[in-house]
């Protein structure tokens, strides 16, 4: 959907929602807050594999942040699993990105509420990622190491359990099956 049409759609939807909430005697101020918060939601999706250069640049940008004492990184890599005698050559990731970005945002905000974090970046691939390439990059920073270790583990588990991202495992012969997270 072109950007202008998308904005008109969301504006129309927001007006409809506010009128519906008024009719139901629901405080629509909370609705305004929701739509304001929505503007803070970042797009975490990167087309294709996440490159080592992208990861290195992200790390390098934090050298000047001297209040940070610890960083921890998770890199999810596509495995060349052997399934029923066939080797996975790639995974094609798809998602309803708006819903997935909202879920990533909720996970991120919950981690900031639970742990003493300074910074967090999450990136996930969309489209085709070949075996051996990076598909998930989570970068967590804090004044102290204990928080980054605990927070990173928590965030990665929440991503795997909650975010609606679908992976089509493509085999070397171009046949495929839909991935099941374990």
Stretches found by the model and what they are:
Residues 139-141:
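Short hydrophobic/aromatic beta-strand micro-patches
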Residues 17-21, 31, 82, 174:
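Amphipathic alpha-helical interaction segments
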Residues 6-7:
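Basic polycationic patches enriched in arginine
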Residues 11-20, 26:
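Short hydrophobic alpha-helical segments enriched in small aliphatic residues
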Residues 23-35:
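Short, Lys/Arg-enriched N-terminal segments with co-localized hydrophobic residues
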Residues 143-145:
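Helix N-cap motif at beta-to-alpha junctions
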Residues 35-134, 150-153, 157-182:
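N-terminal, polar/charged subdomain of small-to-medium soluble alpha/beta proteins
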Residues 1-3:
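Methionine residue identity
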């Amino acid at each position: 959907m072109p950007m202008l049409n998308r904005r008109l759609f969301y504006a129309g939807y927001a007006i409809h929602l506010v009128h519906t909430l008024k009719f139901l005697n629901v405080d629509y101020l909370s609705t305004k807050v929701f739509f304001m918060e929505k503007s803070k939601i970042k797009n975490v999706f990167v087309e294709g594999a996440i490159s080592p250069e992208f990861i290195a640049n992200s790390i390098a940008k934090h050298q000047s942040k001297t209040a940070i004492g610890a960083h921890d990184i998770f890199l999810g890599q596509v495995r060349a699993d052997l399934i029923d005698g066939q080797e996975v050559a790639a995974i094609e990731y798809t998602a309803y990105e708006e819903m997935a970005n909202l879920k990533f945002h909720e996970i991120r905000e919950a981690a900031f509420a639970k742990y003493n974090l300074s910074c967090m970046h999450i990136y996930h691939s969309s489209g085709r990622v070949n075996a051996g390439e990076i598909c998930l990059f989570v970068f967590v920073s804090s004044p102290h190491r204990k928080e980054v270790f605990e927070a990173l583990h928590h965030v990665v588990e929440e991503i795997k359990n909650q975010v609606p991202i679908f992976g089509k495992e493509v085999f070397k012969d171009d046949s495929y099956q839909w991935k099941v997270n374990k």
